[in-house]
């Protein structure tokens, strides 16, 4: 799965089992890292409406992957806590990131300075 294919998949028509289907496709393609990168990139270079769809739906798919196969997300846990959770700017994506973070803090222990960033971001949201 290429970045262009992933963006197309996230920005096209939404359907009832979207998150399950896309999460399965991403995992089967070994593209969890690519999904993580796309979702946390702030979708620079995409038209605003497309960027919002990619951020929101990508965060939804990432949440699905996290809860269905947490081990596939764990390589990104440190980065998620350190920079990507606090930097999330899309209000719709924040909802999915917050669900992941609420569970992640029971499985992963971030650095103290990262915990402060997480708390500040959550309070700001």
Residue spans for each PLM region:
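Alpha-helical scaffold domains
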Residues: 1-125
């Amino acid at each position: 799965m290429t970045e262009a294919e992933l963006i197309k998949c996230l920005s096209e028509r939404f359907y009832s089992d979207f998150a399950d289907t896309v999460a399965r496709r991403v995992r089967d393609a070994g593209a969890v890292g690519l999904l993580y990168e796309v979702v946390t990139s702030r979708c620079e270079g995409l038209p605003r409406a497309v960027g919002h769809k990619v951020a929101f739906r990508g965060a939804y798919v990432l949440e699905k992957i996290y809860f269905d196969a947490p081990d596939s997300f764990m390589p990104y846990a440190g980065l998620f806590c350190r920079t990507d959770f606090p930097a999330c700017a899309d209000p719709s994506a924040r909802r999915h990131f917050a669900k992941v973070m609420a569970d992640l803090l029971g499985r992963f222990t971030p650095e103290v300075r990262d915990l402060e960033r997480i708390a500040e971001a959550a309070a700001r949201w």
